Curated annotation (Swiss-Prot):
It comes from Caenorhabditis briggsae. This is ATP-dependent RNA helicase SUV3 homolog, mitochondrial. Residues 1-29 form a transit peptide. Residues 343-499 form the Helicase C-terminal domain. ATPase and DNA/RNA helicase able to unwind DNA/DNA, DNA/RNA and RNA/RNA duplexes in the 5'-3' direction.
Length: 721
């Protein structure tokens, strides 16, 4: 297996899901995928750009009788010797052999020259002065300065002393060796491969229930909770572990032999008979892929059952080759047909019961929900920021044939984790963040249409706008390229050992240096380090032990939200003082109790507060002594979940809808500029003469009426003291 050092992929890449086509002339979609692949690769900064030089102190007391040895040596003579030293090719060659490249050489030489030419030469190392004197008299060659230069360089850049050790510590090319418990077992690997709604997970879960001891690893806590509930309902005691909670079938003194968990919570030390790893294709995920790689290589079980897309089969086999494990593949076909409609929806009046409009932003969810309400259709709503309870409640309303909410508007969060009786999946757009949907993502979403054993067994996929339908058909017709790279992440032990050699480096600097010098093999890319670094920057000035800091920085927090990021920093600061993060302290910070949401901004505030409570519960699982009030905070989160449910129920009042628009304006807003124009306008920034609101109007579907309403809300906020 080839070893690739130096430049690494930090934030994952789309290379594993956007491989170039084997055909001579790639399609437009493959070309765009290749471009996305190139643009998504983040190169690690070179180590010489990361290290900070240290000041080398002069000797405080000169050796007696130095004048006799150095004679008439002065700074001018020293400068001449140093200039000649710097120009020697042999000196540069020796420097490179010791890890000092050209950029580091210039920085180290500048420091060395400053050290050698102070106003008072008596403060310089006597041995160096004697050599300088001999060189100036022609008795010695300037290349003999190299040992002094190298010693000085290692004082200026301490990492040079430990480069070999740092490279060994940060070697990520053999992750199989990180899991001795799994390597002590001759494991049987079964791959249940098939599309959505093929029954692949069902067959793996049958083996889960039959085993004497088993663990289910799901991608979401919603799915882990569903398996937990269903297993216990079948009379098989099963515990639940997610990042935020642990629940027992009986009690914590009597753990069950069956466990349902999120994939990150799998213990690689626990020996069981069966482990089921769902959605194995998530290996390619740029943020969480490391967890599936870890589960695949580290699960200590006699049988490993993998469920997922066929695109992951080859990479799974390659990952297991070095340890001599083979894979038995079992293929499953979709149980009910999925067809692509010949016509787009085009008008909200064509929406029917069982339809699901899939959007790729919360704003688009709000917009489409408003238009449906204006057409007399009350939709259920699901998007990523909603708490699990609210998502389940909205899913239940949509699935209930007697409920008036028989249409769903959702983000691509419905791609996994929720059982939904969808007849038609309607793509509101074929782009996500101005980029075309990759084929595997479009198939995952479209596959939610039609559910075996329900009234909507036959699924249909289409688009809202007719100009998108051809694009969707082309995307879905593309072959899903086999996954070629999977995520990997450094362990805490590696980071800790790394820090021993660089005791003065901050945690942010440690992460940067680790990524710069580490090695990964061709089948891996580094993920999570970028997200971890964002959190590390937030608490860089907070004095925390390394283990605590590392744990804080691995928490699943959305740093894009400034409020939750600010609360995260406050939690870290209080932790650093040794004060417990109590329920009273947390509630005071959140200005509890919250007010019911009467606007979208107030609903968003409730969602942010829920994320803060979620963060508290996540940390309390790891530091129960410092965050002692997890039960009370969990009760508060349930209250908040219910308030958010109520807010979503009163969706139209939150949208502050005015009089209905005429049908012509509605139809006009259904049309959208081409994907090329959309991508171009998204990159345009407002000029000084244009307002931010006008710029937003140009690059979104916001209507003039929506804009007036937005201005009105902003003016109200501005008038508040």
């Amino acid at each position: 297996m080839q070893r690739a050092t130096g430049v690494l992929r930090i934030l994952g890449s789309f290379s594993q899901r956007c491989s170039p086509s084997s055909s001579a002339t790639p399609s437009r979609f493959q070309t765009m995928n290749s471009r996305r692949k190139r643009n998504s690769i983040r190169k690690a900064a070179a180590i010489e750009d990361l290290v900070e030089p240290r000041k080398v102190k002069h000797v405080t007391q000169a050796a007696a009788g130095m004048e006799e040895w150095i004679g008439s040596l002065n700074n001018a003579a020293i400068h001449m010797a140093l200039d000649e030293f710097m120009r020697r090719p042999m000196v540069r060659q020796l420097a490179k052999e010791n890890g000092i490249n050209d950029k580091l050489f210039i920085r180290a030489f500048k420091s060395f020259r400053e050290y050698c030419t102070p106003e008072d030469l008596s403060s310089v190392d006597p041995g160096l002065l004697i050599l300088m004197s001999d060189i100036s008299k022609g008795g010695k060659d300037c290349e003999m300065l190299y040992p002094f230069f190298l010693d000085h360089s290692k004082q200026v850049f301490p990492h040079l002393e430990a480069m070999d050790d740092l490279r060994i510590i940060s070697d990520l090319t053999r992750p199989h060796n990180w899991y001795p418990e799994a390597r002590s077992i001759i494991r049987k690997i079964f791959f249940h491969a098939g599309p959505t709604n093929s029954g692949k997970t069902y067959h793996a879960l049958k083996r889960f229930g039959e085993a004497k001891s088993a663990v289910f690893c799901g991608p979401l806590k919603l799915l882990a909770t569903e398996v937990f509930n269903r297993t216990n309902a079948l009379g098989i005691p099963c515990d639940l572990v997610t990042g935020e909670e642990r629940r027992f079938a009986k009690d914590n003194h009597h753990p069950s032999q069956h466990l349902s968990s999120t994939v990150e919570m799998l213990s690689t030390q626990m020996r069981v008979e069966v482990v089921v790893i769902d959605e194995i294709q998530m290996l390619r995920d740029e943020q969480r892929g490391w967890a599936w790689t870890r589960a695949l290589l580290g699960a200590a079980a006699d049988e490993i059952h993998l469920c997922g897309e066929p695109a992951a089969i080859n990479i799974v086999k390659k990952l297991l080759e070095p340890i001599g494990e083979t894979v038995e593949v079992r293929y499953y076909d979709r149980k009910s047909p999925l067809t692509i409609a010949d016509r787009a929806i085009e008008s909200y009046s064509n929406i029917e019961p069982g339809d699901c409009i899939v959007c790729f932003s919360k704003r688009a969810v709000f917009f489409n929900s408003k238009k449906l309400e204006e057409n007399g259709i009350k939709p259920a709503v699901i998007y990523g920021d909603l708490p699990p309870g609210t998502k389940l409640a909205q899913a239940a309303k949509f699935n209930d044939p007697d409920d008036e909410c028989n249409v769903l508007v959702a983000t691509d969060a419905i791609g996994m984790g929720l059982n939904l009786n969808i007849r038609r999946v309607i793509f509101n757009s074929c782009t996500r963040q101005t980029e075309l949907l990759p084929t595997y993502a479009a198939l995952q979403i479209a596959g939610r249409a039609g559910r075996f054993g329900t009234a909507y067994a036959n699924g249909v996929a289409t688009t809202m706008r007719k100009e998108d339908l051809g694009t969707l058909k082309t995307i879905l017709a593309e072959k899903v390229e086999p996954i070629t790279n999977v995520g990997i992440a450094p362990t805490y032990d590696q980071i800790e050992t790394f820090s021993f050699h660089l005791p003065q480096a901050s945690f942010v600097r440690l992460l940067d240096l680790f990524v710069s010098v580490c090695s990964v093999s061709d089948h891996f890319f580094i993920c999570t380090v970028y997200d971890m670094r964002e959190l590390a920057v937030l608490i860089d000035q907070v004095p925390l032990p390394l283990k605590v800091r590392y744990t804080f920085c691995t928490s699943p927090l959305n740093t894009d939200d400034k409020r939750t990021a600010a609360v995260f920093v406050k939690m870290a600061r209080r932790f650093a003082t040794g004060q417990a993060l109590t329920y009273e302290w947390l509630m005071d910070m959140l200005e509890w109790p919250p007010k019911p949401a009467s606007t979208l901004s107030e609903l968003s505030l409730l969602e942010q507060n829920y994320e803060v409570l979620d963060q508290y519960m996540w940390l309390s699982m790891r530091f129960p002594d410092m965050l002692p009030d997890e039960p009370r905070v969990r009760d508060a989160s349930k209250i908040l979940d219910k308030m958010i449910q109520d807010g979503v129920e009163g969706f139209m009042s939150l949208l502050a809808v005015g009089p209905g628009d005429n049908s012509d304006s509605r139809e006009k807003r259904l049309s959208r500029p081409s994907e090329e124009k959309l991508a171009k306008s998204a990159s345009e920034k407002p000029t000084r003469k244009s307002s931010i609101l006008e710029a937003l109007l140009k690059r979104t579907d916001i209507s003039e009426e929506d804009l007036d309403q937005l201005r009105e809300e902003l003016n109200k906020k501005k008038k508040k003291p």
